[in-house]
Every structure is written in C-alpha cells, then in structure tokens.
C-alpha cells in the first residue's frame, strides 16, 4: 500500500524483468490491439488555438491529454478525476506522458505491400512465391494481372497478363472461368493461399533429386524462408498490410516556432500523405469511379506507404518543402544518427563538464585539480543535501540562494562533499579504456582542470589546448567502481602489452637521464662515501658534482627485512635516484645504476611493480616524476643551432655517391643495365650515402670532448641527450637537421631518384624544397583520411568481439597452439619468452638437457619461468589459447592466461573481446595520425644479403647447390634453409635462402656472428640451369613471344619475353629454353624431368641460342618490383584486409596435396598444372595459372602440401582449408604483428587470437545427417557439437562441417543477437531477416544489454547476474520442496508472496 502513496504524483508501471526479446511480423489483429483509435483526418493542430484537431494526427481523444490530468476542454482538472473520460471532448484524464506510449492506426482502403519484405534483398515475398522481384512489382504497381485461379483454362497459375492479354482471355474463356487479380490484393491472395507444410515437403524432395549447384542453392534459399515462417508462426499474408500503425505523437512532435511557423517531424508529412490518399481512395470507391482512376489512386497509396516505411528505397525520394529528403521510419533507426547508435548505444549524460587541461606536477598520481566553479556546479545536489542536513537551509530554494551567493559555509561544505568522492576524467577520442580514468578532485583556483603529467600517455594528452570532460559518479556503486577499478593508480600497466604505461616522458626523462650521466675528470673523482647524508653535504659544498665517479655505500634490506648495505661504483646523481627505490630485497641498486634512458626507466618501474606491488610503485612513480622535473629544470638543457653538427666528411661522401650515380647512368647508356635496374641502384646508393652521413654525424655528436684548460669533460651535446634518452626526437629527425634529408617519396609511394642533399641547417634549394613538399602533403592528406579508417576498424573489431567474455575458469581443452620465436631476416624479433609470458602451458615444459619440469601443464608461465626457458634455449612450447578454447559462451580464464593490465590471472567476467579490439584499434589511430612526422622521407626496405645471427656450425636443410662457372656455390633448391647449430647441436637460427642466392658457406663450416652467409640480387629473380650443356630456344619467336627492345636513350637492345597470348597466332606457344648435349639430345634433370625451362612474360634473356652453359649459370632473369616505401599506409589497409579475410588481389596458390608437378594441356590463356599425389588413393589436383605470372616450378618438381605454387600473399581461406586452424592462426597473428612491429607498436598475441577466434565461430555443414540443417548452412561450431552429442546418444546420424573463416564485418552481422547486428550495419536487412524468422534475442552480449538498458553481463554486472541466477534457482528449489512436504495451499501462497517480495 505505502508504495501507492509514494507514487501518487508519479505513478510508474513496475519495471518488468525479462530474459529475451522476440521480433516478428505484426498481424492486423496485433496492430489493432495496440491502437487507441483510428486516425481519419490529415489535420494536425488548430493554428489559432494550438489544440489538436479531433481524429487528426495529434488527436487528444486517441493519444491522451496534452497537460497532466486535464482534459482538452478544461472541464476536468487535477488528480481527483484520474481515469475519467470527459463526455464533451472524449479525452481521458491522465498523465500527458501517455502521448509517448499510445499508438493509433489507419485503416487502408486497399492492401499495400510492406516495402521491407518486398525490396530488402533477397525479397522475402519474391522468394516465397518463387517469382522475380520485377514481376511482383509489375503486379503491385498495376501494370500486369496475375492469374490466381486458372480453373479449366489453358492459363497457368502465377502467369502474368498485360491489360490486353487479360481482355483477350476474358473474351476467350469468360469472366467466371478463371481469376486474375492486380495490385496488392493479388499478392495477398497468393500468399494467403500458400500451404507452407506442403511446399516445404515438396522442396525437400526436389533438393534430394536435383544435381545442379545453382538449382540447389535456389531451392535451399526458398526452403529456408518457408521453414522460417513455419517455425516462427508468422503468416505470409501479414507481409501485405491492411492496417498501418501510427506511432505516438510525442515521438513525432510538432513545435510552434515564434512568428506563427511550426517545426515538425518529417513523419507527420509522410503520415499526412498516406491519410490524404487513403481518404481520397475511399471516396472514389464510394463514388464508383472508373477502374483506371481507382487503380492510379491505389498505386499512389502504395507509394505513400512505401515512403513512410523507407523513403527512397523505391522510385524517387519524396522531399519536403526545402528539397530535403524526408526521414522515414527506417531512417530513424539507421546509421550514426539513428535510434540505435545515437540514443541507445551512446547517450548524453548530466553531471558533466569540460574545460582545458593544464599540467599539475605537484598532484599525487590519484589526484586531479578541479576548478572551484566547476566543482560547485557538478556537486550541487550533494551540497544542497549537506546544507539541509547541517541546518543552514530548510528548503531547496534557500540552499540554491546560498550556493548562488557563494557564501563561505558553501565552500566548507564543498570541501567535505568532494573528499573521497572520485570523478571521472575523459579525453576524446577515447581509443581504449585508459581514455577514461577516475581521480580524486582537489579544489583549485582558475578555470582549467589540472592533470597529473604521468597519465598523459594513457590519455594521449598534451597541454597545447586539449580539453577534457569531467563526469561525477553519483550512486554508491558507481563511486565504488570508480575507486576500485578505474582509479588512475590501478591502471599502471598497458592492457595491450602489459608494459607500464605510467612512465615519465619528455622533460622527466631528460632530467633523470642527466642525473645518471657519468663524466670523466670531475672534481672529487674516486672519493668514498658512507651514506647519503655525507654525499648530500659534499654536493652542497661543490666538492663533488652530480656526475663524479665515486664509491658509495647503498643501504637496502635482505629477505628478512634487516638493513644491509653494499658499496657500489656510482655517481652522486645515481645515488639520489637510488634513494627513491623501495627498500626490497628484489630491487637492487643496479637497476638505477645505469644510464636512465626511457627504456630503462620503464624497465625499472616494471621491476618495482612486479616485486613491490601497486602502492609502492605509485609512490615511487610520483617521486621519480618530481625528481625528473627538478633536475631537468636545474640542468637547463637547451640547444642552439651550433648543436646541430654537420659532419666534415659529408661533401666527400656526396661526391663519391654522385660519381657512382654517374657511372650507373653510363652503364645504362651503354645498355649494360635496364632503366629499372639503374633506378634501383641509384636509390640504393643514395640510401647508403644517407646512412653513412648519419653515422658520421652521430659519431660526432656522441664524441666525448675535454676542456683543454680545466681538463674536465665538456657537457654532452644537448640534442644527442634528448634523442638518446628517448625524451624527444629521433635519429631520423636529427639526420634531417644536421646530416642530409635523403630520398623523398612521391605521393604514389615511389622514391624520387634525386635525393635532398642539403639539411635544414644549411637550408634547401628551391628544387629540393619542391621535391620535399610531395611527401609532406601526402602525409597531411593521409592523416585526415586514415583517422576515419582506423576508427571504423576499431568499431568493427569491437562489434565482432563484444561478446567474448571470461565466463568460466577452465574449459578443459586439450588442444592449443605451438609458440616459436619469430625470426625475421635472421634477427629474432620476438623471443619465445616474450611470446609465452603470461600464458598457460598446455603440456609440461621440460628442460632439454636435464629433463626436469620447468612449468607443469596447466600452470601460468611467469617471469621467473621465462628466464629459465630462455637460458635452456627451448625453441617450441605448446600453450593454451583463446582460439582453441572450448567454452560455450565466451572464453575460459586458463586459455586466456594473464590479465595484462593487472599482471595476475584474468578474472571471471572480464570483457576480453573489447579489450582486444581496443588494443588493436588504438595504435591504428595513433599510427595514422603520425605518418607525416617523417616529413615524407623515404625508407627503403629491401635486404640483399644474410648475416649469421649466432656463432655455430652450418647445416643445410634440403641441400641443393651447384658450383657455377665463377666457382661460387649457388642455391638451386626452392625450399632450402641454412641452419646454425650451437655446440650442443641445437638449432639457434633458421634462415630461408632463396633460389639463385650465392652461398659463402657449406655444410659443416663454422661461422662467427655477423659473418655473411649468402647474398642475392633483390631486384631480379634468376632462372638457372642445373646441367651443363648447350642452350636452345623453343617457341621464342621474334615479334610474337620475344621482342628486341632498344632503349630509347642508349640504343642498346635486350631481348625480352612479351605477352604471346595477345595475338591469335601465339596462343599455343610455350616459350622455353632447353639444354641439350653435343648430340642435340635434351638433357635430364636430377628429378627426372627434361631440362626445359619455361619463361614468363617480362623475362630478360641472358644467353644466346647455342651458348655453352655450366650448372648454376643464369640463363634468364625476371625483374622484380622496384623498392617502394613502407609506411603504415600500407599497414592499416593490410590489417583491415587480414581481419576482413579478403582474398588478396594476386593471391598465392597453395598446393593441397604432396606430390609431383606435371604440366597439363594449356587452357586459353591459363597454364594447367597437375599435382600427381604420392598416395594413389587421392585424386590428382589441377590448378590453372595465368600465363606470364612469374612461375618457378618445373615439370617433375616434388612439392609438399602447403607449398606455394604461385608466389604472393596467400588467401587465409586457403590456409584454413589446407593446413588447418593452427596454421591459419599463426599466419594471421604473424602478419598482423608484422605491420605493428614495423611501427614499433607492441601488442600481445592473445588479443589477435581473441579476434580470430570470433572469426572462426562458424562451420559450414557438409553432411547434414539428422541435424535438420541443410548442407551449406552456417552453424555455430559449439552448437553443432552439442547437437551431434545428443544425436549420437539417441543413436541417430550426426552432421559434420568444415570450419569457415568469416571477415569481422560478416561475423558481426551473423551474431545470434539481432539487436547487436541491427545496431552495427545494414539495420533494415537485419531486422527484416529477424522478423521473418521470428528471432529471439537472449541478451547474451554487451551491446544488446546496453540497448535495453540493463547492466552488461561483464565485470560487476556479470557478478550481479550470476548472483541473481543463483538466487532464482535457490528460490525455485525451496518452493518445490515446500510443495512436496506441505500440501496446504495457504502455505504455498504465503511462500510465493514472500519470494516475490524478496525478488522485488
């Protein structure tokens, strides 16, 4: 009862709890049941009285009163008449809020088709009737009749008749012998008369009988829709509407503007058109107007309803008075401005403010400075409450006055209110979760928010005018979450890679670096100090400087916590820093007794965090920040133009390179090299020159100089200090200031041959300046475009991964991934330790020598284990992965491993999918914003040699080499590798060497680190002979397949293979070179094939017919693409391409089986390759390869499954089909990582794995068994496994399927939740599909729950849901028990009441 009294003034319906939402097609009865009355007039409101017109679009009688508890004519006012219907104006006396809820309807005089089911492809009506969309439209828009009942005539059912044909048929057969209808009535009749069960049975029979793929697809599509209708209980004829619902008037408001005009929602215009046409049609029917006029009116009615539902989907767009298209109901839902994304997924919130940020170096890490004015406004309700409680005011009005006058007691109360009440700070764009963090406010004067310098990295903030928003968490729960989970002190590590993100940068780094410098010959060198006190004394009296080499005792503690001390060689500066280290046995002085570059500082903070915990780390960070600032200020480091040193040898290096380029120019003129080769060599030469000048410059800057008078060391070069410490600037930028700017790129990505020889200190010539504007402009244009692209990528990633949540502790999976170190060009880019840290071991990890267990199976690999693993030199470890996790909804904690942002095993309910998406998307934006910082300077990425990365013994895997006529060893194998073994015979490095490389070592040789192993020409790919003999040409016909091209500038000719398929005469040619012996017999190769070498287009012939060649000699060469600059520009689209699982343009062709290569008959302009399997039970596989693609296999080559037949980027689908899930995972992870690694961005593999897991959720049914699926259906992998288990138990036939890889957009749209899919993309299509199938959304993921306004099932929300579930289950158990024991109804009733109350 007391609830009623409480809610007297604002009665609200109790919120209904629900577990799922269903969408289906509304039947006419349903629409009528929603409606409160029919709308008969198109009028809206009376322009004089501003009162709604009766029976109009805003009618108060239908939709409810305009003012609370007041009828329209004013006869009944106030609460006491609640629920009475006024007899004069017919308005119910109730809240005006019902105008947001009550719907009306329009009775249509003729049925119309619902445009969504008609035009949304595939057209549901069309598929169901098995007619084309064109035909249906002809009927609907009154062009053709359709036969619904042929009777005994020769007409067929569904036959279309034009007006004339219809008349002829009527004359011929008589009007009552058959029925043919026109318009939506016809379609309605056809749909209503469908017997779905019978059609479904017929389709199944047809499916079983048909053999053609196309027909099967068509039948399957139709069967699916028929089954959807059967299962959902929707009727097909409901897709034709006889009644149109009208949405509540407050959702399509009409607002009077000053000056007697009105602003109205577009929907009112659209509804008005429908009502006008409908009323006109009714009148015409009453008047018995001629058929043609009625038909025209019906067609116009259909168009009006179409425009109301989806304007512009069919015909021309209906525009308003200002030529702007009207927003239809579909447009209200669609896109960024639609209902889903604008109002449901993101809302504007109150209790927020924004202001400019300034730095607050005296704040603690958990604090922020909040301007008093802002705090007063934000915390108003709290202040009012406190003023009331303390008796300063008795009403809100008084409190308001006090606050407005800013009385002194208000400020005291504000202090109390703010104490311990965290606020959230957010900087847009919020690219990852660290873009919103909680701080404790401290009140400050002024109008700018103060931000702690150490959190700037996380927010990506700087103080050049950035603004930030402040939000106040109101409820106790929100304050608790802000404090416990979002406080800046809890976000020390980066969620993407687990490294500290609270790291000093810029000035702080410079200060700490300056503090840690050691200088020679400083005063007091070699002195010994007992403790910090003495040292401080000496410093103050200038006996020593910060950089003097000294010995000093450093005090720390041992494992029991007793003080111990040890003497170190160090400097006073480093001792000052050492004093700040937490006293802990695991934190030795050594970690700050070194040059404090940014990397080392980061390592130091990481070390302190791992060993001393969060609290100590936060205090330590604050202290080193203050120390850094203090000493950066004291040191006074700055630089002038003379600090940019131009190396003396610059002129000499430039002159030498210019001489080289002249020489290449000459070689080109003499015809020794091609234009392309010349270009590559010139670019190469200038690249090397730039590097050389840079090296010289850096050497000059690094050099230590001594003052001849005092003998003391001069201060280091300031610019070098800034760059080397990692505070600001890079070698690249210094090179442009003091070396030479180097090569520039054109906007197309090619490199301009003439470099910029000057640097910024000397100044550029006009030509150089012009050349360099190219790259700079491209950078600026790219930035603008790519920010959007990167944001879109993040959005797709979040959408596909949003429901990957940690939902259980251990799924018990017995499969996983194999981790190996990543080696790139012989360098280890990611060690095995880095890759397995924080992952769960799948099998026990054993020491390779002693065999002892380092990590047991199922335990997480920690830092200490990694050290042992790296020392033991283990090369391959099996770990658990999210990709192979067997949890039904979400991922299990064991498969995921460590929560990188906390450094502990991941908690249940953590939204790992969203974290993964943010970790991958955030650097994308960063990188795209940073392209132009290089000023468009080109970096050539091409290697042409291989150096040993370790000492050891050489072993050649798949050895296949010959000595050529120059006496060099040449690699003849396609898949040969050079292995370097250490003393114990373990592989330390594996280098792939390409076909045609020159080898400098052979099996069993020992190599030193850095020794050259092999080299090759990166710009051409050679074709070499394996046997000695005489060359003969086959099918190399002048003018057809070979042309002598003379270079315009030199007149030298070279013979090049041209595209022989372009002429009809050349279509059967197979240009090749054969090697014969003296007798003219074709020689055999080692593998048994003939020594015939097929040539592809653009090959340059290197020998003449009849020439004598030795094994390993080059007989032709194929030029490669010239060097393009690598830049994340290639990177971001590449990442998107991989995640979208698109087939690359010229994708590689991969062998599906092991076998021998044979050449088959060529087909048009394709070359046919057949692989004959080694195993006779398998069929041979054929591939068609476009002629003229560089192709390196020869007849008779042995090929293994998974090897490339044609080079290029492989299509991920092929890898999945041929090599399986694990190979696909490692390919995608490595490719994506490579893009980010190039930019120096660290992302943990597990994030990419989580996304790939979401892409691999579905299987395509191949054998349906008794599952009830149709072959070709995409089904959830785990769902299929569950169904199969059930079928096997029942003794039925299980189904089977192959895993399919879906791109992230496709995977997002295929989620089981239609709400989530609709809010992502293609809203109309998703909703149409869901409505036909009567889909149920069980609200499992995050987005669905945000949209319906519930706590998300992750984090604290996940726990709340879990507790609720447990409670409900427990209640049900108790009720059941009671029912069994006491049969008395009263006891039951009482108990039910009790549980209901408890639930409420």
UniProtKB/Swiss-Prot annotation:
Q: How is the cofactor bound?
A: Binds 1 Mg(2+) ion per subunit. Binds 2 Zn(2+) ions per subunit.
Keyword Disulfide bond applies: no
| Top EC class of this enzyme | transferase
The record, for Pfam families, names:
RNA_pol_Rpb1_1, RNA_pol_Rpb1_2, RNA_pol_Rpb1_3, RNA_pol_Rpb1_4, RNA_pol_Rpb1_5
Instruction: Return the CDD domains for the record.
Output: RNAP_beta'_C, RNAP_beta'_N
Output the Gene Ontology terms for molecular function.
DNA binding; DNA-directed RNA polymerase activity; magnesium ion binding; zinc ion binding
The residues that hold Zn(2+) 2 are: 811, 885, 892, 895
Q: What is its EC number?
A: 2.7.7.6
Which reaction(s) does the protein catalyse, per the Swiss-Prot or TrEMBL entry? RNA(n) + a ribonucleoside 5'-triphosphate = RNA(n+1) + diphosphate
Where does this protein hold Mg(2+)?
A: 462, 464, 466
State where Zn(2+) 1 binds: 71, 73, 86, 89
The source's superkingdom equals Bacteria
According to the UniProt record, one GO cellular component term is: DNA-directed RNA polymerase complex
User: Which keywords annotate this record?
Assistant: DNA-directed RNA polymerase, Magnesium, Metal-binding, Nucleotidyltransferase, Transcription, Transferase, Zinc
SMART domains given for it?
Answer: RPOLA_N
One GO process term, biological-process aspect: DNA-templated transcription
Q: Which InterPro entries match?
A: DNA-dir_RpoC_beta_prime, DNA-dir_RpoC_beta_prime_bact, RNA_pol_asu, RNA_pol_N, RNA_pol_Rpb1_1, RNA_pol_Rpb1_3, RNA_pol_Rpb1_3_sf, RNA_pol_Rpb1_4
The record ties this protein, via Gene3D superfamilies, to: 1.10.132.30, 1.10.150.390, 1.10.1790.20, 1.10.40.90, 2.40.40.20, 2.40.50.100, RNA polymerase II, clamp domain (4.10.860.120), RNA polymerase Rpb1, domain 3 (1.10.274.100)
Cofactor annotation: Mg(2+); Zn(2+)
Q: How does it assemble?
A: The RNAP catalytic core consists of 2 alpha, 1 beta, 1 beta' and 1 omega subunit. When a sigma factor is associated with the core the holoenzyme is formed, which can initiate transcription.
* Role: DNA-dependent RNA polymerase catalyzes the transcription of DNA into RNA using the four ribonucleoside triphosphates as substrates.
**PANTHER family reported in the protein's UniProt record:** DNA-DIRECTED RNA POLYMERASE, DNA-DIRECTED RNA POLYMERASE SUBUNIT BETA
Q: Which family does it belong to?
A: Belongs to the RNA polymerase beta' chain family.
Protein name per UniProt? DNA-directed RNA polymerase subunit beta'
